């Protein structure tokens, strides 16, 4: 279902498409440089970057990636980012929100191979 309100406006302005894990995205950068893949497969891009949007009520499904992943909250929020380490240890919650006295920050880096959902 298309996003409504400000989220819908951003989907249109940024030319976002539905993301397979939920939300909306568009790749905005793919490095010409490559690096070895951590699991020995062929080389991969040294850096990629996407615009990603979760409208109110949307979720990003549990997933993990082979590289560190940086989240940046640019508008809206707060965003609840759930994390589980590769050994399936303790569940952690990081709240992305504008900087405040409670320690909220608008960005977080999820380490490679950690499970994450938002």
Positions of predicted regions on the chain:
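Non-catalytic, conserved peripheral segments adjacent to functional cores
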Residues: 1-109, 116-118
